[in-house]
Amino acid sequence: MKILVAVKRVIDYNVQIRVKEDGTGVVTDNVKMSTNPPDDNAIEEAVKIKEAGKATEVVAITVGEEKAQETVRKALAVGADRGIHVKVDGILEPLAVSKILQKIVDKEKPDLVFMGKQAIDDDCNQTGQMLSALLNLSLIHISEPTRPY
């Protein structure tokens, strides 16, 4: 069984954010970035399932600027087998990200797709639901880990 896990690069949760002077967003220059914490949880659960012998491969995917590859590297460091980085410049809306993920899912053909419950940078909780609709697949929304695997 192959598990694909989407991971997002966000401003680290310990950073006190500052709004740009023109009010168009938050300052990200020289700000510590990290993997979205709920996505860390998704990677961790996927790796645990693989370690229990219930999955054969965990693939981490991120969509974002060049530096977003750091999130894939972190996923590899904790046990993902492969990583995919779709490089895009600028900020994408959740539907655009969902459409990119749809193409990856169509190509990779995973048995499961894990995503964190929401991103801490926007709290929208839209990408997973949109991806589910685009793929015409069922969605298990905000599940709790079950033990044992």
Spans of features found by a protein language model:
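Short glycine/serine/threonine-rich phosphate/pyrophosphate-binding segments
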Residues: 13-15, 39-43, 68-70, 121-127
